């Protein structure tokens, strides 16, 4: 079987150029204001939504969003298909491409996407892998635009500063670096030694920052919170790491996002968390339940940003 390099997929944050990312974010705002204004899946046409990892927000937001676009979500978990059980991912993608308009997948190894992309003739969407979580970043950027750049739109993100505290060696930190740098935002990963991002992801973010003017910083110093417009954290123990034998609590205690940390940020700074959150662990209840917190707007924006992404991908495939 031949590869399909011309198909536009969204497997990583840098699969969109800065201009394309801005287009998606602008469309997301439109779809939030007019949820049923785009119906590219009218028919209904189908989208495969595949889960190797369990989810709440990903499943509900994609299922509802596909319905809003006029389509039908075929939701399948790993226990009810042959994926990874003898049939190759290449064969699976080739077959599914005959049935559906797009494939959305939440999986473990990021390399799985590259295997499916070899034969998929429809767009693949990474709804989460061990390396990256690019759909979440689109929702976060939409939330930041709403709160910090409502008049300018995505263009107003340029020069804003975001800081992420906690485990810097996970998919969220990787995507924040690349996705925010794509938007022209300065992004700082504040994490203890031994839990900082891998060089390959820092380099990808820096490369994108060279295009947009964004600065990428990796440090263990909380002083870096100064000047932040956005403060972000994530769970200290990501899914699948519960029993890896590594102490994922003690090193992160100094990096909890609490009132003291928020006081270091700019006046009017907002707090984001992709959820689920553990109050008293990575974030104090006073922060996540306080006025700076936009976590539920952020969760809602998964719906709108992912709809915009699907509309954009379906409209930008080779004819």
UniProtKB/Swiss-Prot annotation:
Principal location class: cytoplasm
Cytoplasm is among the record's keywords: yes
Record InterPro entries: Asp/Orn_carbamoyltranf_P-bd (IPR006132), Asp/Orn_carbamoylTrfase (IPR006130), Asp/Orn_carbamoylTrfase_sf (IPR036901), Asp_carbamoyltransf_Asp/Orn-bd (IPR006131), Orn/put_carbamltrans (IPR002292), OTCase_ArgI (IPR024904)
Gene Ontology biological-process annotations: arginine biosynthetic process via ornithine; citrulline biosynthetic process; L-arginine biosynthetic process
Signal peptide from the UniProt entry: none
Enzyme Commission number(s) of this protein: 2.1.3.3
Protein's pathway: Amino-acid biosynthesis; L-arginine biosynthesis; L-arginine from L-ornithine and carbamoyl phosphate: step 1/3
Listed Gene3D superfamilies: Aspartate/ornithine carbamoyltransferase
Residues annotated for L-ornithine binding in this entry: 171, 234, 238-239
Enzyme class: transferase
Any Pfam family hit: OTCace_N
UniProt keyword annotations, A-Z: Amino-acid biosynthesis, Arginine biosynthesis, Cytoplasm, Transferase
Sites where the protein binds carbamoyl phosphate: 55-58, 82, 106, 133-136, 274-275, 302
The reaction(s) this protein catalyses: carbamoyl phosphate + L-ornithine = L-citrulline + phosphate + H(+)
Entry coiled-coil feature ranges: none
Entry GO MF terms: amino acid binding; ornithine carbamoyltransferase activity
Localisation: Cytoplasm
UniProt GO cellular component terms: cytoplasm
Purpose of the protein: Reversibly catalyzes the transfer of the carbamoyl group from carbamoyl phosphate (CP) to the N(epsilon) atom of ornithine (ORN) to produce L-citrulline.
Record family assignment: Belongs to the aspartate/ornithine carbamoyltransferase superfamily. OTCase family.
HAMAP family for this protein: OTCase
Protein name as it appears in the record: Ornithine carbamoyltransferase
Organism, scientific name: Corynebacterium glutamicum (strain ATCC 13032 / DSM 20300 / JCM 1318 / BCRC 11384 / CCUG 27702 / LMG 3730 / NBRC 12168 / NCIMB 10025 / NRRL B-2784 / 534)
Gene name of the record: argF
């Amino acid at each position: 079987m031949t590869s399909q390099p011309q198909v536009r997929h969204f497997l990583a944050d840098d699969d969109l150029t800065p201009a394309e990312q801005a287009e998606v974010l602008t469309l997301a705002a439109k779809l939030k204001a007019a949820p049923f204004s785009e119906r590219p899946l009218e028919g209904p046409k189908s989208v495969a939504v595949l889960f190797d990892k369990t989810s709440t927000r990903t499943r509900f937001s994609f299922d509802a969003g596909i319905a809003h676009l006029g389509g039908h979500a075929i939701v399948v978990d790993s226990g009810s298909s042959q994926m990874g059980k003898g049939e190759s991912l290449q064969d699976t993608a080739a077959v599914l491409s005959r049935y559906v308009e797009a494939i959305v997948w939440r999986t473990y190894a990021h390399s799985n996407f590259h295997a499916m992309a070899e034969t998929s003739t429809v767009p693949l969407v990474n709804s989460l892998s061990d390396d990256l979580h690019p759909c979440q970043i689109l929702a976060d950027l939409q939330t930041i635009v709403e709160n910090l750049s409502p008049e300018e739109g995505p263009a107003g993100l340029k020069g804003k500063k975001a800081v992420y505290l906690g485990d810097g060696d996970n998919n969220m930190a990787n995507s924040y670096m690349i996705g925010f740098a794509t938007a022209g935002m300065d992004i700082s990963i504040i994490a203890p030694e031994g839990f900082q991002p891998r060089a390959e992801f820092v380099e990808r973010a820096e490369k994108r920052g060279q295009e947009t003017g964004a600065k990428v910083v990796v440090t263990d110093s909380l002083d870096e919170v100064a000047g932040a417009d956005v403060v972000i954290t994530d769970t200290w123990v990501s899914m699948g790491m519960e029993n890896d034998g590594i102490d994922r609590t003690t090193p992160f205690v100094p990096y909890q996002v609490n009132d003291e940390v928020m006081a270091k940020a700019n006046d009017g700074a907002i707090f984001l968390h992709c959820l689920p959150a553990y109050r008293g662990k990575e974030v104090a209840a006073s922060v996540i339940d306080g006025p700076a917190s936009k976590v539920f707007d952020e969760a809602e924006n998964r719906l709108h940003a992912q709809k915009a992404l699907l509309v954009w991908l379906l409209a930008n495939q080779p004819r």
